[in-house]
């Protein structure tokens, strides 16, 4: 009779001496034994075997995890096939990294306490045979158990840039190696250097162990305290089976089934390699799903990624679970090694659309698509745009009564349709599915021309948006499938109606010819800046209104005008802006650089008297003028004149224009052509103290 002893890892299973075990399925039959309880107790020999070790690993592979837990090849195959349910510290086997761009370091504490074995001369003595032996497919009997406990502290960093993974992992390993020797102060806190604290604050901790803890550690400091308590918690009464020795059942019962030679190594290697590749694929998919998906286009990609994940889990991972394919891991006949039965199923997987090469190729394409869209979104990130995720949301934006113009950057090729995903779905449902492998020709983003064109349009959209300060113009980003428009387009809407499919440069009419005030509607500027206001200027109505009067006490603020009754707005302008001024009395309105002098009667302090400011003025006795660099030019206006001045700044084009405003119509008065070299500020002179002239302005267009 064969008398080979088999050694297996317990993996949290409730082994007892004399228990029956089917090594072909790695199935334990708890509660069944060949001997009476009294015989087992009389035949048990126990010896102390105290030991403790710790080990650190940065690997997350199933092979290295199995090595830490002393799991041999056949048992590993059963675990991969889902035949055994692990418990206690063995749950560490199921704990895998979620992201590729994540550092992981694991600390193992392992202790043993005692070894129990049955006397070897038991053989058939006192064996209690019964009919149930004919129904139990046990191949072995437990004759020895090593007791102890395992503890795994799994430290994970946050998701980081791929270039930093190795550096962070090295830093983590260095500080985790110190855990057995880290000192704890009298106050119970862990003593670390500031650099070590910075490192440990960036990662979390998970615990898998055979110890009963009040609460599991979640931080590095918790882990240190728990680790140092483990030796005191270890005792014979708390120890669990760690390693089990078994002898063939045929030693006691000749009709028992036998375990034949294990020839499953080739298929085991294939299964292991494929499942490891699937784990890597899952992390890549999680990395992509974790990225921001609020932007237009990305919600379609998220939907495709989730569908992809669902299909490969069903087609590639679940087939190795007995609940889905019980015949895969059932014995093909008495005495044979059943794990070989999964070979045909596994070969079918390698020939199917769900083979790992095809899955990785699809994931390469998905990552490429994400990167192309991300590059476009990054370009327009700083533009004041709004993402539109549905047709109804688009309609709401366009129907907004305040919006007269809308410019929309549209991803035209982003869709949730995918031929490869359809093939995966077909394969899972059909008896004779079609063969299919993803081809780069199926995907637009694998070319160079289309992504480059999309980025060019993204730059153009950004330039349009960044130069516009107009509440009546809205910039949107959306995904609208249209194969006729390659990759991306810029749509222009006017009052909710699409006017242009591929909007390039907006046609800005010459400033001298504009007559409709609506051309400028919605462009805004900020209110006058109280800190700059001359003491004789009184601001009201949220600083929108300013009038001259009796000087008030004021501080000696260096920003304040001390001599000329002037005030600036508080925000510099460097885009396109329009504002209106209701005025009366002695008034000037225009723009200036921030560096205008504030504390002197000299001409460089007065608006329009240097090359730093451009203004239009009104004085009841002399009429209207435009002034620049101390050159004052009269502008003829028909009687009775006007009390509302429109000012249009086109900073990018280098123009400043003034208009007479009546109702909704404007009449061009004058345009300065200027080469701006910095932001400019709306500025006003209101009244003149020496001339005993008062003035008043009220700012519109805010």
Curated annotation (Swiss-Prot):
It comes from the Eukaryota. This is Cytolytic toxin-beta. Residues 388-515 are annotated as: Thioredoxin (THX) domain. It comes from Scorpaena plumieri (Spotted scorpionfish). Intrachain disulfide bonds may be present in the heterodimer. SMART domains: PRY (SM00589), SPRY (SM00449). Heterodimer of alpha and beta subunits; non-covalently linked. Also associates into tetramers or even higher aggregates. Glycans are attached at residues 94, 101, 286. The keyword RNA-binding does not apply. The first domain (residues 2-265) is structurally homologous to the membrane attack complex-ferforin/cholesterol-dependent cytolysin (MACPF/CDC) pore-forming domain. It makes numerous contacts with the FAT domain and comprise essentially the core pore-forming machinery. The second domain is structurally homologous to the focal adhesion-targeting (FAT) domain (266-385). It makes numerous in cis contacts with the MACPF/CDC domain (first domain) and the thioredoxin (THX) domain (third domain) as well as extensive in trans interactions at the SNTX-alpha/beta interface. It is found in: Secreted. Coiled coil: none annotated. Keywords: Cytolysis, Disulfide bond, Glycoprotein, Hemolysis, Myotoxin, Neurotoxin, Secreted, Toxin. Residues 2-264 are annotated as: Structural MACPF/CDC pore-forming domain. Residues 265-387 are annotated as: Structural FAT domain. SUPFAM superfamilies: Concanavalin A-like lectins/glucanases (SSF49899). PROSITE patterns: B302_SPRY.
């Amino acid at each position: 009779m064969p008398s080979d002893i088999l050694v297996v890892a317990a993996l949290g299973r409730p082994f007892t001496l004399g228990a029956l075990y089917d090594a072909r399925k790695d199935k334990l039959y708890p509660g069944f034994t060949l001997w009476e309880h009294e015989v087992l107790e009389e035949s048990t020999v126990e010896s102390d075997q105290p030991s403790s070790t710790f080990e650190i690993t940065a690997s997350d592979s199933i092979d290295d995890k199995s090595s830490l837990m002393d799991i041999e090849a056949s048992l590993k195959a059963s675990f991969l096939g889902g035949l055994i349910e692990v418990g206690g510290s063995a749950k560490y086997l199921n704990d895998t990294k979620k992201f590729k761009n994540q550092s992981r370091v694991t600390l193992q504490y392992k202790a043993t306490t005692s070894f129990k074995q049955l006397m070897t001369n038991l053989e058939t003595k006192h064996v209690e045979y019964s009919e149930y032996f004919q129904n139990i497919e046990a191949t072995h009997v437990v004759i020895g158990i090593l007791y102890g406990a395992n503890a795994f502290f799994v430290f994970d960093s946050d998701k980081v840039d791929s270039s930093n993974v190795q550096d962070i992992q090295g830093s983590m390993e260095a500080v985790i190696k110190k855990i057995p020797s880290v000192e704890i102060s009298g106050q119970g806190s862990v003593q670390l250097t500031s650099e070590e604290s910075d490192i440990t604050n960036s990662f979390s901790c998970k615990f898998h162990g055979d110890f009963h803890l009040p609460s599991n550690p979640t931080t590095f400091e918790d882990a240190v305290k728990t680790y140092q308590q483990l030796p005191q918690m270890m005792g014979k009464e708390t120890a669990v089976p760690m390693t089990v020795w078994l002898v063939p059942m045929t030693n006691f019962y000749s009709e028992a089934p036998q375990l034949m030679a294990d020839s499953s190594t080739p298929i085991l290697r294939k299964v292991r390699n494929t499942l490891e590749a699937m784990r890597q694929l899952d992390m890549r998919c999680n990395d992509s799903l974790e990225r921001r998906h609020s932007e237009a286009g990305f919600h379609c990609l998220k939907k495709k990624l989730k569908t992809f994940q669902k299909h490969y889990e069903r087609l590639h991972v679940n087939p190795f679970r007995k609940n889905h394919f019980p015949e895969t891991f059932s014995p093909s006949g008495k005495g044979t090694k059943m794990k070989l039965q999964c070979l045909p199923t596994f070969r079918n997987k390698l020939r199917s659309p769900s083979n790992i090469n095809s899955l990785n190729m699809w994931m390469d394409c998905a990552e490429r698509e994400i990167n192309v869209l991300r590059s476009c979104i990054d370009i327009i990130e700083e533009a004041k745009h709004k993402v539109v995720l549905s047709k109804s949301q688009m309609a709401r934006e366009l129907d907004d009564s305040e919006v007269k113009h809308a410019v929309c950057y549209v991803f035209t090729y982003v869709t949730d349709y995918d031929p490869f995903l359809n093939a995966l779905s077909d394969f899972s449902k059909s008896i004779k599915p079609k063969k299919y492998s993803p081809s780069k020709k199926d995907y637009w983003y694998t070319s160079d021309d289309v992504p480059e064109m999309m980025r060019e349009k993204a730059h153009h959209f950004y330039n349009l948006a960044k130069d516009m300060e107009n509440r009546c113009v809205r910039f949107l980003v959306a995904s609208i499938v249209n194969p006729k428009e390659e990759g991306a387009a810029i749509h222009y809407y006017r009052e909710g109606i699409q006017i242009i499919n591929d909007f390039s440069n907006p046609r800005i009419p010459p400033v001298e010819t504009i007559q409709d005030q609506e051309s400028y509607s919605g462009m805004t500027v900020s209110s006058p800046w109280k800190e700059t206001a001359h003491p004789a200027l009184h601001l009201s109505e949220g600083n929108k209104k300013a009038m001259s009067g009796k000087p008030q006490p004021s501080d000696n603020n260096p920003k304040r005008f001390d001599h000329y009754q002037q005030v600036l707005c508080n925000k510099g302008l460097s885009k396109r802006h329009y504002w209106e001024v209701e005025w009366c009395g002695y008034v000037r309105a225009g723009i200036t650089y921030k560096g205008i002098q504030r504390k002197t009667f000299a001409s460089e302090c007065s608006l329009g008297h240097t090359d730093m400011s451009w203004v239009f003025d009104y004085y009841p006795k002399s009429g209207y003028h435009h002034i620049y660099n101390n050159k004052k030019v009269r502008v003829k206006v028909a009687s009775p004149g006007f009390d509302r001045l429109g000012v249009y700044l086109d900073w990018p084009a280098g123009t400043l224009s003034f208009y007479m405003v009546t109702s909704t119509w404007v009449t061009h008065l004058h345009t300065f052509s200027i080469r701006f070299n910095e932001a400019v500020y709306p500025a006003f002179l209101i009244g003149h103290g020496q001339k005993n002239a008062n003035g008043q302005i009220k700012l519109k267009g805010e």
